[in-house]
Amino acid sequence: MFDSLAGELSPHDFAEFALPPLQHIVTSVRARLWENHLPAVPLILFAKGANAPVSLSAAGATGYDVLGLDWCVVPEDVRAAAPNRALQGNLDPNRLYGGREAIENGVRQMCATFRAGNAPPKGWIANLGHGITPGVDPDDLRWFFQCVHKYSARGVVP
C-alpha cells in the first residue's frame, strides 16, 4: 500500500482518517487470499511522511508485514515503535542525482543505520525512501544497486 500523502495529515487525523482504510485493505486482502486458498504474501505499507511517534506506532499495528520508510524518518524510531515489523527504505531518492560518490556515501550510511540496534539483516529491505523520478540516469540507479549489494552483505562493515 503506497500512500504518498500520509504526511499531510496530523498524527490525530492520520489515525482517524487514514488508518481505518489501511486496516480494511490489509484485512480484506488477507481474507481474499485465504478464501481462495492462496498462500499468504508479505504486505507492505508505505505511508510517506507519517513520521510522528504516534503515527509510526499506529502504522506498526495495522497488520502489514513491512513498513516502508521515507528518507526523513529515523529507522531506530520505527524499530522502537514497531519492533515486530520488517523495514524497507530509506535512501533519499535525490541522492541518485548526486553522482556515484553521493550515492555510495548514502548507501553506506543507510546500511550502517539499519544495522544499528542489532536489527537482523532479514528484517530490512534496502530501497529508496520514495519512488524513482523520471530524470534518473539508469547507470546511477545501477550503481545504487551495486552499492546496496556491497554494503548490505553479511560481514561487511560500512
Locations of regions flagged by a protein language model:
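Active-site loop segments of alpha/beta catalytic cores
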Residues: 1-158
